[in-house]
Amino acid sequence: MASTSQWKYDVFLSFRGEDTRNTLVDFLNYALQRRGIDTFKDDEKLEGGKIIKPELSKAIDESRFAVVILSENYASSTWCLEELAKIIDCKKEKGMTVLPIFYNVYPSDVRKLTGTFAKALDEHEKLFKEKVGRWRDSLNHVADIVGYHVKNR
């Protein structure tokens, strides 16, 4: 579907693998692809503490939409936070449509940066002080977008 326009992918999926890979993400990816929607889903286990891989940044740039699946451990991953910051940049600069899914977390936890989100950002502050402000802003921004709240417990 995306091949006829400037977009290589219709949808970029941003998620924390340990929380969602074998449940919601696989189901969502399968359902979208069955309908002819080209998705980008990174299948590698990403290590924290490194910059976002260039191919992920490029895939975000080449995607028309982003689905951000915010889960309990999403903010503990610097990779996820870097993806989110890039997605929010694309939303602001290119009009990318962003759909947040709050998976087993409340939107208010993301918006107010409480619970696991606060704990993760406090930990990141020790090593990535210069980036944490941007990550906080990105989390606040995505939490203000109307999305879906999915509770699977």
Predicted regions and their residues:
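Conserved N-terminal substructure of TIR/SEFIR domains
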Residues: 1-65
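C-terminal interaction surface of TIR/SEFIR-family domains
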Residues: 1-11, 22-26, 106-153
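Amphipathic alpha-helical interaction motifs in eukaryotic regulatory proteins
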Residues: 14, 29-33, 40, 57-64, ...
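Structured beta-strand/turn binding interfaces of compact recognition modules in eukaryotic regulators
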Residues: 14-18, 35, 40-44, 49, ...
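Eukaryotic basic, amphipathic alpha-helical target segments in cytosolic regions
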Residues: 21, 32, 36, 60, ...
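Intrinsically disordered, low-complexity regions enriched in proline, serine, glycine
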Residues: 23-25, 40-43, 50, 77-79, ...
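Amphipathic helical hotspot of TIR/SEFIR-family domains
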Residues: 58, 62, 69-119
